[in-house]
Amino acid sequence: MYRYKIRNKWNIALRICLFLLCISSSLHAREIDLSTSRLLVSNSIQSPVKETIIRVLQEEIDKRAGIYPDITDTWEGTSIIALALSSDDSLNGRALPEKAKLSLKAESFSVIVEEAPSQTIIWLVGVDARGVLFAAGHLLRTSLFAGKQFLFDPSNAIKSEPEYPIRGHQLGYRDTANSYDAWSKEQYEQYIRELAIFGTNCIETIPFDNTPSPHMKVSKEEMNRHISTVCKNYGLDYWVWTPVNVDLSDESLFQAEVKKHSDYYRRCPYLSHVFVPGGDPGDNHPRYVIPFLKAIAGELKKQHPQAGVWISLQGFSDEQIDYFYHYLETESPDWLRGVVSGPGSPPLSDTRYRLPQKYMHRHYADITHTVRCLYPTLRWDQAFALTLGREPVNPQPFYYAVLHDRYAPFTDGFLAYSDGAHDDLNKCIWSRKGWSKKEDAIGITEQYVRFFFGINSGDRVADAILGLERNWDGPIEANGGIEMTFSRWQQLEQAYPRSQEDWRWQMLLLRAYYDTYVKRRKLYEQALERGANDLLAQAPEIGSEEAMKLALKKITEADRINIAPQLRTKIEDYCEALYHSVGLQTSVGKYRASGPERGCVLDFVDYPLNNRWWL
């Protein structure tokens, strides 16, 4: 009887599994084939954003599937991707779906599927041009491109609006960047495009940094004009970060600085916001900073009437902070758009509490650094801190998702600090979290893998990326996951040879090899030190000089014998590949990085992990 019950339960379980498998198969079969799609576009979408969206769809689909969707002005064909505004009553004689009715919140969009026996229509409907861009981004992120196929699951149809109006990243074309300064105009546009596909709506640059870089392909003036134009074409906000490094109490210096801004505003083709940090750098009292901001706001309005001026309270004393808020309370200036909170600022919660509601509040979050920074990596082994340093490849989806959700409620969004491509996944995490707090780190990472590598979730590449984050959790000696993650990345390295030319893939593999190399070295070198200490303990028997001689010979074996030369070679290979693919400068000597803290992981790859330098 007992065996019968058990057998019966197994039969029931088996039937359930088969049923679920059938459902799964049918769901997969429900994917819509858009391989023959053409684009039908509403003329009411504002130019030049309309033309940019068309180009984005055509080029990104072509890259992934070898399919170039043509533009059409008719509804003929088996599949149509229709782009329209929610204010349109119809598109080429066909009424928009009822689901296309959107709220008036800027950037809102719908992706709607209409199926008939002879035709499928994918509607990309935005409340504005930027909404249509983000609808296109949703389609690209959630579609599956396999061979010559372009597939979309109807369950990914959506009606969506952003939670935070500011979602951006600083991409300063300057010498201290670990990669941006080596980029071409085409690379900058492609990167901005990819950030927009993930929901970014603003980009910030640094126009007044005159330090030359040996990597720059064009002048900083030309590149900043180009980035400004790219933002205009994509319908994104363009910010500039403009610290004041002169004494504003000196009237002549004050006027010269105002003129510098005025001249720049005239030359800049498109500008949305000007951010002047109160400090870091700069040490002017707000009694001088505020009149300066008012003066440049007047100049800004002449050239860019819709643009706004922002200030941060970075480095301000309590007296200076009180001075600033007293000014806002008594004067309530309309020329000030908002306040930025960054490293060295008062807490975000305090700023939002004291800041009058008419002013916006932006988070200047540091998502690029691991140590000596606003949000240092938690429980990071000292061996990683000594070798990887402050600016390594640092995909940390869980950590940065938590940080975003912790601080976002006190702000109107973020424009994050970044000094290179190494924090690429963190940018995508914040861009998606800024759109919706309901999105989680795993889901965003899976979108990242699908869009950039064309790999579906079945190969668990997202898990391998999350494994790199877990590599940094706690003492190396106790972290058995480092070797497991490395083994998985070696399998992926062999399974996807075509991805070897992709800089994002190269960065992840570099980290997998580097983390494992550091762990093996630490275990080896710490064992040598224990052996050296054992030899020193024999001094009473063999004499102190002999004991010291043997101990030094033992502990310095690490300088003569490399425990993992194959891993070391792979690290060099990936550093070389990344220099050529994305301009990543991992060495001061070899790749002319601006300084050892700027991502120079190759220069510190063999940094001692025992005390041999001090014995």
Predicted features and spans:
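Acidic, contiguous N-terminal accessory segments
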Residues: 14, 18-23, 27-115, 152-155
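Feature activates predominantly on carbohydrate-active enzymes
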Residues: 32, 47-48, 53-56, 60, ...
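Catalytic-core regions of glycoside hydrolase
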Residues: 70, 146-148, 201, 214-228, ...
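Short acidic, S/G/P-rich loop/turn micro-motifs used as interaction or catalytic elements
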Residues: 44-49, 88-91, 176-178, 212, ...
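Bacterial N-terminal signal peptides that target proteins for export
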Residues: 2-16
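Terminal accessory regions of large proteins
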Residues: 464-479, 485-615
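Composition- and surface-driven signal marking solvent-exposed, interaction-prone regions
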Residues: 12-19, 27, 53-54, 138, ...
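Structural motif
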Residues: 41-46, 83-89, 125-127, 173, ...
